[in-house]
């Protein structure tokens, strides 16, 4: 068996670029802002890419406290949390229960909206790709709390490090409102450091201008 490689931001950025997960250019976001980059974790759709992402989540979780259960919000978070559970077992010798939610509750079989490990009385870490407005995270936090869970924190792939409607970023708003930590594998600063190291002056200048306008 090949030993998984530890997560490094630069290696992940390069893989994301090669898969089209990360693109530099000009992209209009739902907010109406014109961003100099775009990140779509849904394109991490092969074994190598998913494995590297999961390794990043697993490495980060070993530095966190209160990891009773890991949880992936439907739908994108489901493969992320499953792969992370495997990475925790294979590379850190930690067997961590995992679960996810359905978009709609079942009224037959085992029923309900939650699938996988029981969360009642457990400290749960939520794993997702990004927090854009924070709406989806707030919804899943409510679901988990209603099931008796304590939210230990949130782990995302990318922190855009930009303001929401106010002076705080979406991640900062979630941290303040829900009083939980939110950690990211890579940040906008990591992307800028990568561009600087590669000598991509135009893309870096566009990122710097965007950060000056919207950054935190």
Curated annotation (Swiss-Prot):
Reactions it catalyzes: orotidine 5'-phosphate + diphosphate = orotate + 5-phospho-alpha-D-ribose 1-diphosphate
CDD domains: PRTases_typeI
Superkingdom of origin organism: Bacteria
Biological process according to GO: 'de novo' pyrimidine nucleobase biosynthetic process; 'de novo' UMP biosynthetic process; pyrimidine ribonucleoside biosynthetic process
Matching Pfam families: Pribosyltran
Function as written in the Swiss-Prot or TrEMBL entry: Catalyzes the transfer of a ribosyl phosphate group from 5-phosphoribose 1-diphosphate to orotate, leading to the formation of orotidine monophosphate (OMP).
NCBIfam families named in the record: pyrE (TIGR00336)
The name this protein goes by in its record: Orotate phosphoribosyltransferase
Lineage of producing organism: Bacteria, Pseudomonadati, Pseudomonadota, Gammaproteobacteria, Moraxellales
Gene: pyrE
